A protein has these predicted regions:
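Glycan-recognition and catalytic cores of secretory/periplasmic carbohydrate-active enzymes
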Residues: 1-247
Length: 247
């Protein structure tokens, strides 16, 4: 599924891409799965699975981390480039991209029960978890390879997406399910602190502070973002649902 239109005068059109596909697209597959449930038409489900499978093959590095952008040839579908748009460099670890991968493949497992998808979500999470420069509060830098780490801006949106995915992951019959929940709990404790949660009526009435949209584009740097709040609230809902079940 192509992510961006490369025609016209947009910045995307100036990158020389033919068919750019971003890891963010994994977040859109849930809509296709739902479309099949609502319509009874398996076409949507099949497209989602095809996209997930191709992304699994082309977008990940051996260590479990992912590229942001894969540019495919319009002619034959081969990979032309593996790059970034919002990360520090093509080979760097853009944190929100890793978050999208963890969340997206957890959803794909939920909808298909294909263990390969869950294994990828876990592998990408373990990669992030084991990075030596992951901050103690578990809120990632916007890019884990940014040259100004540890002074680099944090990205609360990445943290909230990862936490929400981990809560879902913790509900599956996995040997490390408890550790996924514990990691998510620690993220949520950090996000709920005054370091990241704004005072009532401040921060443009957003909940979370300190997210990053795209530093390479000098866009949305150290600001509140609506999707940071969305996945934070979703994570809170999942956390409370799990706690109610445990009573």
């Amino acid at each position: 599924i192509q992510s961006w239109d490369v025609k016209g005068n947009s910045w995307q059109s100036k990158r020389g891409w033919e068919c750019p596909v971003i890891i963010d697209n994994m977040m859109n597959l849930e809509l296709l799965f739902e479309a099949t449930k609502l319509s009874g038409d398996s076409t949507f489900y099949n497209v989602a699975v095809m996209h997930a499978d191709r992304t699994l093959k082309e977008q990940f590095r051996p260590d479990g981390s992912c590229y942001h952008v894969i540019d495919y040839s319009i002619e034959d579908g081969t990979v032309r480039h593996r790059q970034t748009a919002q990360g520090y460099s093509d080979e760097s670890v853009w944190s929100r991209g890793q978050a999208w991968a963890i969340y997206g493949y957890t959803v794909c497992y939920r909808e298909t029960k294909n263990r390969t998808y869950l294994d990828q979500a876990i592998k990408t999470f373990e990669f992030m978890k084991n990075l030596k420069n992951m901050p103690e509060d578990l809120v990632p830098y916007w890019d884990m390879d940014a040259p100004d780490v540890p002074a680099a801006p944090r990205d609360a949106s990445s943290a909230s997406v990862i936490a929400s995915a981990l809560y879902e992951m913790s509900t599956y019959d996995l040997p490390d399910a408890a550790s996924y929940r514990a990691y998510a709990d620690k993220i949520m404790e950090s996000l709920a602190s005054e370091s990241y949660t704004a005072k009532l009526g401040e921060n443009g009435r957003f909940i979370l502070m300190h997210s990053v949209g795209s530093i390479p584009h000098n866009s949305e740097v150290d600001v509140p973002l609506n999707y940071a709040d969305y996945y934070y609230l979703e994570a809170l809902k999942r956390k409370t649902d799990i706690e109610k079940t445990a009573i």
